[in-house]
Amino acid sequence: MRLLSVTFWLLLSLRTVVCVMEVQWCTISDAEQQKCKDMSEAFQGAGIRPSLLCVQGNSADHCVQLIKEQKADAITLDGGAIYEAGKEHGLKPVVGEVYDQDIGTSYYAVAVVRRNSNVTINTLKGVKSCHTGINRTVGWNVPVGYLVESGHLSVMGCDVLKAVGDYFGGSCVPGTGETSHSESLCRLCRGDSSGHNVCDKSPLERYYDYSGAFRCLAEGAGDVAFVKHSTVLENTDGNTLPSWGKSLMSEDFQLLCRDGSRADITEWRRCHLAKVPAHAVVVRGDMDGGLIFQLLNEGQLLFSHEDSSFQMFSSKAYSQKNLLFKDSTLELVPIATQNYEAWLGQEYLQAMKGLLCDPNRLPHYLRWCVLSAPEIQKCGDMAVAFSRQNLKPEIQCVSAESPEHCMEQIQAGHTDAVTLRGEDIYRAGKVYGLVPAAGELYAEEDRSNSYFVVAVARRDSSYSFTLDELRGKRSCHPYLGSPAGWEVPIGSLIQRGFIRPKDCDVLTAVSQFFNASCVPVNNPKNYPSALCALCVGDEKGRNKCVGSSQERYYGYSGAFRCLVEHAGDVAFVKHTTVFENTNGHNPEPWASHLRWQDYELLCPNGARAEVDQFQACNLAQMPSHAVMVRPDTNIFTVYGLLDKAQDLFGDDHNKNGFQMFDSSKYHSQDLLFKDATVRAVPVREKTTYLDWLGPDYVVALEGMLSQQCSGAGAAVQRVPLLALLLLTLAAGLLPRVL
């Protein structure tokens, strides 16, 4: 296959070789310029065409600019530079380096620990770390980028060095000795045998480079080393010459996997931080990559052998390393896709996203959209509190009339962030293109940031039915518009075709689907009587069906009580509701004797399940609220700010003068964040509104768009989804608590 690919490229290049008389190669040092000139002379002497000219730049970035300006044509770049050149300047990779025939044009970045330690990828905070050097691919860019992108490490104000210094319990990062964070980042470095050159980014620092970082771990200075997949095997089992490694055995070390597990050193293909792309030659987007490969391929056929007059893949003659190409290159191959994203790969791209924070481009302010006078007051207090602690970027507060107005303002660039609930997140993403930057966590023991919507029935062998057999049954709901008790179950039933509203009249359709229901509402007037038929009001029979605690079947516990007391056959509640009201957790007379084992869940697949199997048997997983921003906003900066802020202000009893997750001081609820929030959390892999909401929730939410509703497809572009429900209601019908 490789022969066919090479042949194709050579034939393709013949069309343009006669037109292009020379290729200008950009170099970044005097030594590289000299090697380039020697290569040009060698190629010319061998009759290789087109001619190769050498243009010297100041750096890789400078060369990229020269290529963009057509003052140069080609340069070999590493992964990070390829990303920047492709994303910002439209350059494309056309020829790749191969270092190992077994794995081709890539290698793997791994995290290594001692086998007898208990460190995992999830417990790296506070451990001592060993790195190959600052800005090195596998020793810095990949691990730090991965930790940021995955949410393990938060970075405020693009200050990555400070974030890493605060995160680890001491490090050796050669090359950071002149930074303001050298105390932590150079703490583990040892220098040479005389104790000089500590933290130098050179072999004078004994813990520099791949072998040095591993030595840092092996000698007990550090707890984790970020190196290449081959580093441990190259320095253990008698494979290393230095005395420090002679007694080391590879079996005494393990790899940290992204899923929190560990693996043997030889399992790097499945257990690594990222697959790292090889260096590649890049050119302008309009240049023929086949021509470049034809030139270099003819060269490597003649000048990649030990006895050849010129050595393409060696820099020894210039007393340097990796000039023009990496010295470890075995051969050059054409890149078929000529696309920087395809060449870099998803794992590497994700890691790079975590590092894409330029302090020079960081906005001075993060403008927060607020919706009420109390929220404006709390936002102002937050801005002052953050500023006093020198948190960056600073907060500014921008007022809006509604969540949708906030979405419009953010899309237009007039404000930057707002916290939204489920259906508003859907609209913000679908209509305005916004993305989640951070989420809320409501219980420390539940890392999913959400809860499950379940349909609960009594365990009764004589009256057993499934979720597909709800027509004609009696239903219990917390209140009209409740996420778990109305939006999701009714939306799901509509989407699955069981409930078919006519003219957007969801209420009538639901009242006709069930035999009877209790759906408490703020104003029961002009409300289908069947939706109040099962409600009982207070102890004196008053306030029946009212959307407040005066109705005994109001709320999630009330809906479950409706089922318990045999008023209804099914209750739509949260997955926690049954447990909160059974086995002694609720002392009220109606619940004190209940056992959760006497109830079951109705599953979408037609089965029933125990109530503790809610993760596998549910109607949807409800997402937590999320901070939404424009897609060009650096989400890691937003989370980095919130994470540092919550360390100071997240505890409701903190003494720092502001409570992020408490609104009682303002005589209101859920201002800026839900009061139930215990922490702001990173979005991790849920970087789009669809990812954040989850497929089941989206299906249920879209189910509210009845297929019988005229103009429903356009309605989503104009009004919130739940407004479709309100089309049939008089003003003030919904209860206040949604």
Curated annotation (Swiss-Prot):
A Pfam family assignment? Transferrin
Spell out the subcellular localization from the entry: Cell membrane
What start and end residues bound the annotated signal peptide? 1-19
Checking SMART domains in the record gives:
TR_FER (SM00094)
Q: Which residues form the propeptide?
A: 710-738
PROSITE patterns, alphabetically? TRANSFERRIN_LIKE_1, TRANSFERRIN_LIKE_2, TRANSFERRIN_LIKE_3, TRANSFERRIN_LIKE_4
Grouped into one coarse class, the protein's main location is: membrane
Q: A Gene Ontology molecular-function term?
A: iron ion binding
Would you kindly state one Gene Ontology biological process term found in this protein's UniProt entry?
A: positive regulation of extracellular matrix disassembly
Q: Name one GO cellular component term.
A: cell surface
* Modification Phosphoserine, positions: S462
The task this protein performs is described as: Involved in iron cellular uptake. Seems to be internalized and then recycled back to the cell membrane. Binds a single atom of iron per subunit. Could also bind zinc.
Q: What is this protein called?
A: Melanotransferrin
- What organism, scientifically named, is this protein from? Mus musculus
